[in-house]
Design a protein with these regions (language model features):
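Membrane-lumen/periplasm interface segments of specific transmembrane helices
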Residues: 48-63, 67, 72, 218-231, ...
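Short hydrophobic/aromatic helix or loop-helix immediately within or flanking a transmembrane segment
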Residues: 75-89, 98-121, 285-289
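Loop-to-helix entry region of an early transmembrane alpha helix in multi-pass inner-membrane enzymes
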Residues: 107, 111, 119-138, 302-308
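Transmembrane-helix signature of polytopic, membrane-embedded enzymes
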Residues: 123-127, 143-165, 332
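Transmembrane-helix motifs of polytopic, lipid-linked glycan transferases
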Residues: 130-150, 316-319
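Membrane-interface alpha helices of multi-pass inner-membrane proteins
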Residues: 164, 185-190, 198-225, 248-251, ...
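Short acidic/glycine- and proline-prone juxtamembrane loop motifs at membrane-interface regions
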Residues: 174-180, 351-352
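Signature aromatic-anchored transmembrane alpha helix within multi-pass, membrane-resident enzymes
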Residues: 246-250, 371-401
Length: 402
């Protein structure tokens, strides 16, 4: 019985594969061979995102806007560039009493922007764009690697293409943190399903320094590590790396949250107070229900009902994903992302963006397309492309946050 077969029969421990894998499995660890296999998927992803950027550029020129400004300095991008240039310390006080601090933004991405601008003569916005594009490519490769490992090349290629054609996929071409988080998450999950514990923990730690919902990666690593330690109870060898991964995984997220708390004078609650200033808190979806009710009773911007539809589809896909009995690592990672998105309040229109790193949600759709007739599959992909390019362009100029 192959390692893949054992994983499917025992999904709880699907992340741990037999070290005596086949030659084809071992070749996955060879970067050149792995990149060669992923090349068609990466080419499709690049084509999708380049087309999306061309559409954004054409519309920007049509309305007298700068394409670069839309992609590099919109909404959150301005905050990241500001942190990169001046460090933390900016606070905005609004007439309604809201207090928004730049401490809500995690440090790794602006730190990388600062590193690039210190050695290359480019602006922070340009550096942020380049970093996002590189991270998006690395993320697409990581998504391919995970899905290929579990389901084969055809499904992996379709998943990468679908990820590049999501309604909010324009964010993957902007100076935002979702590409970087997804890159760390995908490769951490790949390290988990191939038994590379230290890599899994280290990458999860970096994910936790990238975005608040990066804690989902740490949750996956710790859950799998806990199961592995339970499986190895009573044995003496091979446990140190598992413990190390479990310790490394949440270190980035916890370190930043505690640092913000110390800076605000409340070690445990300071960071969450900062998030409250942005109306972001976990309230089990009560805030979202209020927004949905207001959409029924009063006019609203187009992005709000679209966010509701996309988030609803995401929840449905998660249910289908769970029914397929996925590996524990993917189940926990995706479940935590969905829980944070659905249960959090604030910035309702941004919920689809928060789900962008949850690429395993696309597995049920990709599997359905592999079983569909070619004409039907092409029609679905073309429709998704049209929606992605048009809605993505709208998002870059919309009066509401991405």
């Amino acid at each position: 019985m192959t390692a893949h077969a054992r994983a499917r029969r025992c999904p709880l421990f699907a992340e741990t594969f037999d070290k005596a894998a086949s030659t084809d499995d071992r070749s996955v660890s060879r970067p050149r061979a792995a990149l060669h296999r992923a090349a068609p998927a990466l080419a499709l992803f690049a084509a999708a995102r380049l087309t999306g950027m061309v559409v954004v550029a054409l519309w920007a020129w049509h309305i007298g806007r700068s394409p670069r400004a839309l992609l590099a300095t919109s909404w959150d991008s301005k905050w990241y560039v500001g942190i990169a240039a001046n460090g933390y310390g900016r606070t905005v006080y609004w007439p309604d009493g809201a207090v928004q601090s730049d401490l809500a933004f995690f440090p790794l991405y602006p730190g990388l922007i600062r590193a690039v601008t210190s050695v290359v003569p480019v602006t922070g916005g340009t550096a942020g764009l380049v970093l996002s594009w590189v991270a998006a490519g690395a993320a697409a490769w990581g998504v391919y690697a995970v899905v290929e490992r579990l389901h084969g090349r055809r499904l992996a290629t379709l998943t990468v293409l679908l990820w590049g054609l999501l309604p909010h996929a324009v964010v993957l071409s902007m100076a935002y943190t979702e590409p970087l988080l997804t890159a760390f998450a995908a490769w951490s999950l790949y390290a988990l399903v191939t038994g590379r514990w230290l890599w899994a923990g280290a990458l999860a730690g970096l994910a936790g320094l990238t975005r608040p919902n990066g804690i989902a990666v740490a949750a996956a690593v710790c859950a799998v590590a806990g199961c592995e330690l339970w499986r190895r109870r009573g044995t003496k060898g091979g446990r140190a790396a598992v413990w190390a991964a479990a310790a490394l995984a949440p270190a980035g997220w916890l370190g930043y949250v505690l640092w913000v708390g110390a800076r605000k004078g409340d070690v445990l609650g300071g960071y969450f107070a900062v998030q409250s200033g942005w109306t972001s808190r976990f309230d089990l979806g009560l805030g979202s229900l209020k927004v949905i009710r207001s959409m029924v009773t009063a006019p609203t911007f187009f992005g709000f009902p679209m966010a509701l539809v996309i988030a609803g589809v995401g929840v449905l896909l998660f249910a289908l994903f769970v029914l397929d009995r996925p590996p524990l690592a993917l189940l926990v990672y995706t479940g935590v992302l969905v829980l944070i998105t659905v249960g959090g309040s604030g910035f309702f229109e941004s919920k689809p963006r928060f789900l962008l790193p949850a690429f395993p949600l696309l597995l049920p759709l990709a599997a359905a397309l592999t079983r569909a007739r070619p004409r039907a599959a092409i029609t679905v992909i073309a429709a998704l492309a049209g929606l992605s390019f048009c809605y993505g362009t709208y998002l870059t100029v919309a009066p509401t946050a991405l």
